[in-house]
């Protein structure tokens, strides 16, 4: 995303070029960009000179949205993940879980304030 943000004024860039510059495999990069595209953070341009570019200004994309697009959630702890709650018999009465939820909320709020443009 930083690579695209740096080129924002110059148009789209081919994934192969990003893969080469960032030393990332094409297959992995294709998976990342599928998630970013689905989330509306990047868009693909087809044809000669085509490739990917940011779907909106880097100043309007926050880091939280990028992480959610790539990871699906921000749950750092198993016991705070909705899917895992059913496996924890102590969830509702666990003091640690409530602290961890507060930590995750603080991290989420912070990441929502950081814009992609700030990383340039």
Cite the ranges covered by each PLM segment.
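N-terminal helix-turn-helix DNA-binding core of bacterial DNA-binding proteins
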Residues: 1-24
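Non-DNA-binding regulatory cores of transcription-related proteins
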Residues: 55-120
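Residue cluster at the C-terminal edge of the helix-turn-helix DNA-binding motif
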Residues: 38-41, 69
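Basic amphipathic alpha-helical segments that dock to polyanions
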Residues: 32-36
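Key DNA-contact positions within bacterial/archaeal DNA-binding proteins
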Residues: 27
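Alpha-helical residues within the helix-turn-helix
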Residues: 20, 37-38
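Beta-hairpin "wing" of winged helix-turn-helix
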Residues: 41-55
